[in-house]
């Protein structure tokens, strides 16, 4: 969950438009007979393997948000980065964010002629652990929290001495103290130089050596900018250009991503302005845009409601995606899209109630939602489909976590992502796929022709088991994530009698 969670926490009703609530899932697939399940007839899956509808551009991925449990030496940190490394995803997003200034901001005090406050001692361990865990894969870096001294404020903004203590009002100020943006661009130039150029020279001419020579393939410029520092499209575009200029001086090969909007459907003006090349300085690239979606139920709803609310809200978001993509194609057709925060936020998050975990099936339901979004966004040829987020825990959006903080294991949301990531890739052909029968809307299905064979992705959106009759089932095998797999990887499913049984909220990949 990126940085705007804070803002949503402070004004939840407004942000529901941009990040919606939480999913609850329970599901598993297993061998089924041809007998119909009680209350629902089996669905019939028909696939035309020779009829390609679209070629996928979509990479399944996720984000890592800096939180204290990810600090080096914490048990959850070691387990989490082990999971990241074993997953091996491309374009994982890394976001040190605003509640923890000491873990996110490298120069917390304004420089003077006598001294500067550059300090990476708390930032480096988590960042290096992330870069080591993603070695060999492109990443999306985003140090989105700027030093507040860059902005005009009535008085200096304070922050806790304890780096683990959250503060929700750090991002104060709307007007830069240097209206040209050069001071801000210089901060990011030095920050990036620390990691890619072995160090930097500070404002007083003092050299700071790191010895690091990492590559930053993609840099996302700030986060949820309509909230943090209350930027207008004009403000943000000017600041984007200044930051890109600064980072390009340190890392000429880096590509850039913009906006990371929390509430995209509320802000078409950002897309119209930012994607227009005439509004940028000459030579400033807009390689990617990004924006977010969270499903969010009301407090009175239960899991029996969530199974409808989440997918209904997802469909609303998909309409927003289509609208935004038309703007992109019109103004900047070479720009790619990263939907880098996709998930659910339950209304109990960050309250006393979030210490009571949701039903176990919730995480399967949330996994089913991600699978549904991956299918739909692949059809729309969205480039990056990013699940949010690796680590959450009570007081810090536990409903969005992909790790079980009680046992340090990946939860079903992680295993659904791994199943999809291992099965589907950009370049796969999506072919005509049809589910027939009463209740066909309860399951989403999409067949792909991949370099490793023919596959279909199935997502049960409902809290009851559903049978699906498969073509050529005798030649097929299946993997599934469901309630029976718990915090363990997808399991093999033996198919008999031509059917697969999708247990509540199951996500399955059938291969031929």
Please provide the spans of the model-predicted regions:
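Glycoside hydrolase catalytic-domain groove-lining segments
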Residues: 296-351
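Substrate-binding cleft and catalytic face of glycoside hydrolase catalytic domains
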Residues: 87-310
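C-terminal beta-strand-rich structural cap/linker in extracellular carbohydrate-active enzymes
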Residues: 491-512
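N-terminal secretory signal peptides that target proteins for export/translocation
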Residues: 1-19
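Carbohydrate-binding surface patches
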Residues: 438-474, 481-483, 505, 509
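Conserved, mostly hydrophobic/aromatic
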Residues: 62, 130, 191, 219, ...
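Aromatic/acidic polysaccharide-binding cleft in carbohydrate-active enzymes
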Residues: 339-424, 428-444
């Amino acid at each position: 969950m990126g940085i705007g969670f804070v803002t949503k926490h402070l004004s939840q009703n407004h942000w529901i438009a941009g990040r919606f609530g939480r999913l609850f899932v329970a599901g598993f697939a297993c061998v089924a007979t041809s007998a119909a399940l009680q209350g629902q007839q089996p669905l019939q899956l028909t696939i035309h393997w020779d009829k390609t509808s679209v070629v996928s551009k979509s990479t399944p991925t996720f984000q890592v948000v800096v939180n204290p449990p990810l600090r080096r030496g914490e048990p959850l940190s070691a387990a989490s980065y082990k999971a990241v490394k074993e997953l091996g995803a491309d374009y994982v997003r890394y976001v040190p964010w605003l509640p923890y200034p000491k873990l996110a901001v490298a120069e917390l005090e304004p420089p003077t002629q006598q001294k500067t406050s550059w300090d990476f001692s708390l930032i480096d361990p988590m960042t290096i652990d992330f870069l080591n865990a993603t070695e060999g894969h492109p990443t999306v870096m985003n140090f989105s929290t700027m030093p507040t001294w860059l902005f005009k404020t009535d008085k200096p903004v304070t922050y806790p001495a304890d780096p683990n203590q959250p503060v929700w009002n750090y991002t104060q100020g709307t007007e830069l103290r240097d209206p040209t943006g050069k001071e801000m661009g210089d901060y990011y130039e030095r920050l990036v130089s620390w990691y890619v150029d072995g160090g930097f020279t500070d404002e007083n001419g003092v050299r700071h050596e790191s010895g690091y020579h990492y590559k930053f393939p993609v840099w996302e410029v700030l986060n949820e900018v309509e909230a943090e520092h209350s930027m207008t499209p004009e403000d943000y575009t000017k600041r984007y250009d200044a930051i890109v200029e600064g980072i390009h001086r340190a890392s000429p090969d880096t590509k850039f991503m913009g906006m990371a909007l929390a509430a995209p459907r509320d802000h078409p003006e950002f897309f119209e302005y930012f994607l227009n090349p005439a509004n940028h300085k000459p030579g400033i690239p807009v390689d990617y845009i990004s924006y977010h979606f969270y499903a969010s139920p009301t407090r009175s709803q239960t899991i029996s409601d969530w199974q409808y609310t989440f997918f209904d809200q997802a469909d609303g978001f998909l309409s927003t995606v289509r609208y935004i993509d038309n703007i992109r194609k019109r103004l900047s057709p070479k720009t790619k899209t990263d939907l880098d925060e996709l998930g659910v936020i339950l209304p109990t998050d960050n309250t006393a109630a979030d210490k009571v975990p949701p039903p176990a099936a919730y995480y399967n339901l949330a996994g089913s939602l991600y699978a549904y979004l991956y299918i739909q966004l692949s059809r729309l040829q969205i480039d990056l489909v990013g699940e949010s987020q690796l680590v959450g825990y009570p007081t810090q959006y536990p409903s969005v976590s992909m790790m079980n903080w009680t046992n340090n294991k990946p939860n079903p949301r992680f295993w659904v992502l791994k199943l999809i990531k291992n099965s589907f890739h950009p370049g796969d052909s999506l072919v005509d796929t049809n589910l027939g029968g009463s209740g066909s809307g309860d399951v989403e299905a999409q067949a792909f022709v991949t370099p490793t064979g023919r596959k279909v992705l199935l997502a049960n959106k409902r809290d009851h088991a559903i049978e699906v009759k498969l073509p050529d089932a005798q030649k097929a095998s299946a993997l599934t994530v469901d309630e029976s797999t718990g915090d363990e990887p997808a399991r093999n499913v033996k198919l008999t009698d031509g059917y697969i049984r999708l247990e509540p909220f199951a996500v399955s990949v059938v291969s031929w």
